[in-house]
Every structure is written in structure tokens, then in C-alpha cells.
Amino acid sequence: IEEALQSGGTVIGISSGGKLEKLISENEESLFLSVPGGQMPRSAFGHLFGRQLSVCWALGIIEKPDDKEILKMIERLRSSSTDFDISGGNGLVVSVAKSMLNRQIGIIAPTILIPAARRFANQLNENSNVFARPSELPEMNHNEIVAWSSANENEHSIIYFSCENIHSRVHSRMNWMLENIDNDSSWIIDC
């Protein structure tokens, strides 16, 4: 960051303060955005992501939805948060978690969702002391599919990330895997 600032670059920084705030605040061409302090990054995700999204909207990197669409997004988040609440939700999160106990976890996602799959795998690896790895469809190769289909189904769980915008061929591959890979702990998460 110091090098970027010294070379005349503009920096947008997001943090809860500290050295980053001091560096950026001293530069008139840069912008510092504060988030609440005292949280580990994984628990501050909403604050960090919200700031990043706002910057991308403001700079035109991502088209900002209209107010009606933003309200629909908030409602979907609220609904998901209620449904997936561990103590008062619909029980799905608890069922998924129990089915994954003492198993390696494979997260299979189309290209458009691989960043989310990678982030989810990292969270599981760090916070749950389990081995999780993401695999990308359609890039997953024949050898990996053979390994999935020949593995002992009690040793691993498979989580498929899906969404309505995936390519029809990728959707076909995912359906093939669901039909042909025996596993009593397979879940589809519709993103």
C-alpha cells in the first residue's frame, strides 16, 4: 500500500483502523472506509463485504440494482437467516452438519460459484477441523469423477453449489454425478 501511495496511486482501504487507516487518511486521493473493530475477519464478513460491494457500485464496477431489487435481496437474506438459524430455523443446517461429521467434504461448484465454494471450504478447514476441498465443474476431470464414484461413501460428504444461471452442460454433469455417485451425505445448496 505504501508503494502504491508513493507512486501516486489511489487506494481504497477497508479496515477497523490501525496502520492502514493512518496511511490512507494521510493521502487526499485515497479513501478509507471503517468497519467495526474487535471482530475476527470471518465474523466481520457482512461489514467487509458490504463496504466492498458499495465501492464497486459507486465506481461502476458492478451495476447497482435499483431500490426495489435491493429490498428483494434484503428480504431473501432475512428469510435465509431465519430458515437457517440453528436454534429456531427449519433444521436443515443441523441435518447437513450432522451428516458431515467425521467425513472429508467435497464441494462441487460451477465456475460462476467456485469463489464461494473455495471460501466455504476454507471456512470449514479453519473453523471445523475437517478436510474440505472445492472442485470446479466442468473442469473436474475424469480421474476425479472416478475417485468420487469409487470412494467409500461413509468417508466423505458432497455439497453441490448450484444456481439458476449455470450452463446447461454443467447442469447435466451435476445431475449425472447426483444420479451415479452413491453417497448418503450429498446436499445441493441453491445459491
Region roles according to the model:
Residues 154-164:
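Active-site pocket-lining segment
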Residues 112, 127, 176-181, 188-191:
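Intrinsic structural disorder
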Residues 32-34, 132-134, 158-160, 186-190:
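Conserved beta-strand scaffold positions in the cores of enzyme catalytic domains, especially
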